[in-house]
């Protein structure tokens, strides 16, 4: 009888470990992120939700925004995120969530007037460490999260690039 309980416990523990480790998203819970999220939500009543996730090999944020988003507001949101996401910040993310490896990119998915469902986002704001998809430390290939792109969903293409 004891062997059956022990075996059931081992199997249950293994299943739990598989479920926990197979989740590709790890919720980011750092002081800087918490303060940034609180500031963003307080400064704009239309921001209903903002969460950050580490999703190897990058950092992902998801925002639920109530109401229409004009290009100027999208650029303003981008500027706010530019102030947070830099090489130093992304290295902290890597140190805390990926054994010291710096995330290769940042993506902000914005969902307007609805809860997020799958990848049915309305806007995507992103930035990368490297200029190309080749991940290396060649100085000619390093952008350091300085270039930001705003894209629309449904093949709308690039709306803004800074």
Language-model features, listed with the residues they occupy:
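Hydrophobic membrane-insertion alpha-helices, especially the h-region
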Residues: 9-19
């Amino acid at each position: 009888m004891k062997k059956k309980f022990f075996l059931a416990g081992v199997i249950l523990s293994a299943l739990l470990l598989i479920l926990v480790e197979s989740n590709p998203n790890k919720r980011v819970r750092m002081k800087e992120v918490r303060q940034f999220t609180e500031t963003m939500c307080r400064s704009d009543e239309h921001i209903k939700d903002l969460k950050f996730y580490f999703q190897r090999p990058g950092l992902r944020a998801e925002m639920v925004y109530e109401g229409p988003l004009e290009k100027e507001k999208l650029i303003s949101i981008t500027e706010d995120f530019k102030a947070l996401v830099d090489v130093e910040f992304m290295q902290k993310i890597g140190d805390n969530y990926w054994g010291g490896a710096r995330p290769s990119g940042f993506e902000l998915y914005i969902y307007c007037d609805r809860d997020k469902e799958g990848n049915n986002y309305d806007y995507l704001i992103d930035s990368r460490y490297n200029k190309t998809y080749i991940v290396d430390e060649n100085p000619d290939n390093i952008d350091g999260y300085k270039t930001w792109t705003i894209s629309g969903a449904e093949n709308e293409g690039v709306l803004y690039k800074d």
